[in-house]
Swiss-Prot record:
GO molecular function: intramolecular transferase activity; UDP-arabinopyranose mutase activity
Effect of residue 165 to A/K: Decreases activity 20-fold
UniProt lineage: Eukaryota, Viridiplantae, Streptophyta, Embryophyta, Tracheophyta
Primary role: UDP-L-arabinose mutase involved in the biosynthesis of cell wall non-cellulosic polysaccharides. Catalyzes the interconvertion of UDP-L-arabinopyranose (UDP-Arap) and UDP-L-arabinofuranose (UDP-Araf). Preferentially catalyzes the formation of UDP-Arap from UDP-Araf. At thermodynamic equilibrium in vitro the ratio of the pyranose form over the furanose form is 90:10. Is probably active as heteromer in vivo.
Names of the cofactor(s): Mn(2+); Mg(2+)
Record GO cellular component, one term: cytosol
Keywords per UniProt: Cell wall biogenesis/degradation, Glycoprotein, Golgi apparatus, Isomerase
Organism of derivation: Oryza sativa subsp. japonica (Rice)
Domain notes: The conserved DXD motif is involved in enzyme activity.
A Pfam cross-reference name: RGP
InterPro entries in UniProt: Nucleotide-diphossugar_trans, RGP, RGP_fam
Annotated protein name in UniProt: UDP-arabinopyranose mutase 1
UniProt xrefs under PANTHER family: UDP-ARABINOPYRANOSE MUTASE 1, UDP-ARABINOSE MUTASE
Similarity field: Belongs to the RGP family.
Amino acid sequence: MAGTVTVPSASVPSTPLLKDELDIVIPTIRNLDFLEMWRPFFQPYHLIIVQDGDPTKTIRVPEGFDYELYNRNDINRILGPKASCISFKDSACRCFGYMVSKKKYVFTIDDDCFVAKDPSGKDINALEQHIKNLLSPSTPFFFNTLYDPYREGADFVRGYPFSLREGAKTAVSHGLWLNIPDYDAPTQMVKPRERNSRYVDAVMTVPKGTLFPMCGMNLAFDRDLIGPAMYFGLMGDGQPIGRYDDMWAGWCMKVICDHLSLGVKTGLPYIWHSKASNPFVNLKKEYKGIFWQEDIIPFFQNATIPKECDTVQKCYLSLAEQVREKLGKIDPYFVKLADAMVTWIEAWDELNPSTAAVENGKAK
């Protein structure tokens, strides 16, 4: 007699990937009602909420989520004088959450980012895709024309060196956005009604030696591999620049990943970016950066890190010194930023003493 095969119901939830190894970091100034939409995907995970702005304001978090919430008073209490390296009145404050996390992986998302749908109409579990990206290797040393060769249905194309097919460890997964594009203020002004409706089903590795503008609103990374480099700089209140926090972190991170032979992926997953920020306010924040970036980009393109720098911390301190020496000639702000970069590493090592001497990759 044939046995009966029981097929599990589709409604039975699968075990969340890395449930005990990943923190979700959210910077905010408002109630987190947007979490209701993300509940099916986020509820099993621990949240770190970094409250920006007025610390006396109460932030409402929907019931049922496991979270810690830190405001400016908490940041000052925990870091003391070193709290000066954490931005105020700017989403760059999120990096405090990276510092206090004790998990191997971090996913960060903005509070105006909703669940997107794929072309079939299915809700996209952005976190699951980020985890897939981080757990599979990257290909920074040779470009594969089928993009990610480790995805189901893909492979290395003819002519791809067999010696490089093992790939490199993936440090960062950079996701994209439907609806409101991540444009700078001048582009926002000339294209106020533009919306991104193109869903490109692809994940690719950013090649070694290539920089890119990292966006922090849909981003995941391996904290053990690259965490100390994910400093979002000095932005916002009291600073001459804003809206360059995630890009600054991305440029520093990419130079260090290249040095340590680590990989960075971009593409899937998509989120739905619901709200356009004010382009006139953005222009005031970005104004100096629009000019400065013409010097900042060549600086990072030409930056070299000594081979003896075999940890992220050593690499980052080397970059900080170069920022002080070279970009400091452009504006005194960069001397202040370089000091903050050093303070950030000191604070990171105080809160994470076991990671201070860990080799993160292989220096090239």
